[in-house]
């Protein structure tokens, strides 16, 4: 897909005025402002360092209105400065006179970070492009830049003003993170070799069902291995008794749980034998080990997959040619219920297959086990990752493609 849009290799960006849209939306301590996970900051250092001879203006967002971590980006600018070892000037507005004056007076090598784009209602209009391009954000900022580098992969599924609003203003260029994400995800989707597997676990049932449908319908994978709450939903859909507390958790956290269970049932019927579920579990708080044929008490929750399931999954993983992994097998944060996740993740890490992982809990677990570097790629995306792998229309990528059609004949690149 990379040839469909501009990349940073297509232009000489030295000395140019660059609008750089990234996504450093990160876990933040709402009381102290401390950045609790800097993985996205580090992921963007390559793009920023490559633009060291340009005049770079960084735009990003943090959380959303109403959340306790909906904060200014002042601390983010300071944190990024420490990572790239270069001063980033913070401007506490997005398009004020002060912001425009600061941008207009930049020298090559300067970096500015503007205020949280979601402080402005125009960012989340959910409107058509004609409306978006006439916002104050676009009208006031667009004349200030030569190029627009769009590198916010984790937000590609959102048609927000600072992401797609400049597609008619000049060349919109995929940044290095965007380019790498798409390259690696496409590599998995179109990888030749069998068997290909997806490990879908954790608690996000709707996302996993969505990906499962796309992966199986388009024969992107041969098998799906389930764990966590995702497995519980498929087990219930398959007619198994998962216990009262486990079903209550599904109902409480999914308003559309009936629709999700129906979808899971249809997938099991349509793709028989290709969605694999646990055969045994560890239960909390009792610590009991039970097989799927045994009863689960009303006060017990499924906290981990059991040893039989680990053995069954391991045999499939060891033969895989390519693996996509999203979600832990159980409550991995509690040591006694982390065994399934640890065993499966370690087996994945040691296989020679193409290995790609995504999702916040997955990456946290991999980091805690010091396994991240053993994988071929770990994605920064959450909802964006799911939407991309599911084959959905992606507003930001669509905008990049349309922009190249608009400006491809006007710019001959380097």
Curated annotation (Swiss-Prot):
What compartments host this protein?
Cytoplasm
Q: Which domain of life is it from?
A: Archaea
List positions binding ATP: 333, 359-362
**Positions bound to substrate:** 23-25, 40, 61-64, 118, 158
InterPro entries, A to Z: Phosphoglycerate_kinase (IPR001576), Phosphoglycerate_kinase_N (IPR015824), Phosphoglycerate_kinase_sf (IPR036043)
**Pathway the protein contributes to:** Carbohydrate degradation; glycolysis; pyruvate from D-glyceraldehyde 3-phosphate: step 2/5
Reaction(s) catalysed by this chain, per the record, are: (2R)-3-phosphoglycerate + ATP = (2R)-3-phospho-glyceroyl phosphate + ADP
The record's keywords, sorted A to Z, are:
ATP-binding, Cytoplasm, Glycolysis, Kinase, Nucleotide-binding, Transferase
Checking PANTHER family in the record gives:
PHOSPHOGLYCERATE KINASE (PTHR11406), PHOSPHOGLYCERATE KINASE 1, CHLOROPLASTIC-RELATED (PTHR11406:SF23)
| Name of the protein in question | Phosphoglycerate kinase
What is the source species? Picrophilus torridus (strain ATCC 700027 / DSM 9790 / JCM 10055 / NBRC 100828 / KAW 2/3)
């Amino acid at each position: 897909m990379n040839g469909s849009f501009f990349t940073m290799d297509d232009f000489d960006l030295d000395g140019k005025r660059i609008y750089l849209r990234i996504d450093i939306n990160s876990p933040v301590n709402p009381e102290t402002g401390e950045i609790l996970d800097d993985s996205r900051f580090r992921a963007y250092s390559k793009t920023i360092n490559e633009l060291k001879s340009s005049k770079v203006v960084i735009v990003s967002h943090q959380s959303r209105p109403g959340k306790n971590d909906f904060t200014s980006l002042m601390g983010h600018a300071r944190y990024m400065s420490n990572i790239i070892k270069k001063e980033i000037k913070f401007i506490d507005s997005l398009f004020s006179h002060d912001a425009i004056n600061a941008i207009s007076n930049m020298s090559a090598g300067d970096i500015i970070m503007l205020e949280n784009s979601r402080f402005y209602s125009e960012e989340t209009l959910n409107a058509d492009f004609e409306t978006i391009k006439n916002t104050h954000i676009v009208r006031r900022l667009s004349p200030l830049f030569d190029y627009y580098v769009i590198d916010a992969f984790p937000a590609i599924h959102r048609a927000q003003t600072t992401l797609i609003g400049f597609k008619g203003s000049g060349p919109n260029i995929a940044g290095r993170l965007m380019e790498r994400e798409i390259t690696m995800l496409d590599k998995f989707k179109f990888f030749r070799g069998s068997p290909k597997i997806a490990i879908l676990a954790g608690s996000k049932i709707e996302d996993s069902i969505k990906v499962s449908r796309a992966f199986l319908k388009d024969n992107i994978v041969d098998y799906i291995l389930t764990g966590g709450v995702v497995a519980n939903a498929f087990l219930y859909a398959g007619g198994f008794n998962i216990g009262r507390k486990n079903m209550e958790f599904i109902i409480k956290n999914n308003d559309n749980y009936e629709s999700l269970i129906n979808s899971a049932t249809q997938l099991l019927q349509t793709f028989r034998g290709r969605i694999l579920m646990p055969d045994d579990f560890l239960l909390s708080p009792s610590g009991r080990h039970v097989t799927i044929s045994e009863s689960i008490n009303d006060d017990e929750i499924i906290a981990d997959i059991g040893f039989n399931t680990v053995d069954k999954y391991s045999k499939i993983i060891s033969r895989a040619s390519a693996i996509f992994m999203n979600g832990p097998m159980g409550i991995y944060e509690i040591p006694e219920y982390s065994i399934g996740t640890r065993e499966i993740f370690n087996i994945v890490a040691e296989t020679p297959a193409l290995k790609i992982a995504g999702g916040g809990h997955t990456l946290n677990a991999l980091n805690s086990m010091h396994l991240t570097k053993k994988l071929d790629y770990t994605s920064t995306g959450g909802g964006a990752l799911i939407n991309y792998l599911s084959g959905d229309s992606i507003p930001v990528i669509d905008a990049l493609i349309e922009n190249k059609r608009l400006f491809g004949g006007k710019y001959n690149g380097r």
